[in-house]
Amino acid sequence: MAISKEDILEAVGSMTVMELNDLVKAFEEKFGVSAASMAVAAPGAGAAAAPVEEKTEFDVILLAAGEKKVEAIKVVRAATGLGLKEAKDLVDGAPKAVKEGISKADAEAIKKQLEDAGAKVEIK
């Protein structure tokens, strides 16, 4: 029996950020495509307008662990693959970069998870 779109969406919705990253890489390899978004050329206002470069890599910065420090450590471990001690040191040493050079979608997902855990986070 074929898998429905709803089944696929349900499975993807329950994945962690790291699992989603692995899935995207698998799609890129299997189908020979790239997940990078293509820049769309807007109608030009003339040659005088300089092209604006869109930022493609983002850093997630943990500003403060908040009240639920243990939850923040769990999220940092899941997002980075660090061990317990390394994740605790990162959270205790805030402000620090949790993850650097990642896509905006991944950065937003990690930021949301950390904020849900009570941490203060920014994306640069």
Curated annotation (Swiss-Prot):
Where on the tree of life does the source sit, at the highest rank?
Bacteria
Any one of the GO CC terms: cytosolic large ribosomal subunit
GO molecular function term, any single one: structural constituent of ribosome
Record SUPFAM superfamilies? ClpS-like (SSF54736), Ribosomal protein L7/12, oligomerisation (N-terminal) domain (SSF48300)
Instruction: List keywords of the entry alphabetically.
Output: Ribonucleoprotein, Ribosomal protein
Q: Which GO terms describe its biological process?
A: translation
Membrane-spanning segments = none
Q: Please name the InterPro entries in this protein's record.
A: Ribosomal_bL12, Ribosomal_bL12_C, Ribosomal_bL12_C/ClpS-like, Ribosomal_bL12_oligo, Ribosomal_bL12_oligo_N_sf
Q: Which residues form the signal peptide?
A: none
Q: Which residues form a coiled coil?
A: none
Family, as annotated:
Belongs to the bacterial ribosomal protein bL12 family.
Instruction: Tell me the function of this protein.
Output: Forms part of the ribosomal stalk which helps the ribosome interact with GTP-bound translation factors. Is thus essential for accurate translation.
Q: How does it assemble?
A: Homodimer. Part of the ribosomal stalk of the 50S ribosomal subunit. Forms a multimeric L10(L12)X complex, where L10 forms an elongated spine to which 2 to 4 L12 dimers bind in a sequential fashion. Binds GTP-bound translation factors.
Q: What name does the UniProt record give this protein?
A: Large ribosomal subunit protein bL12
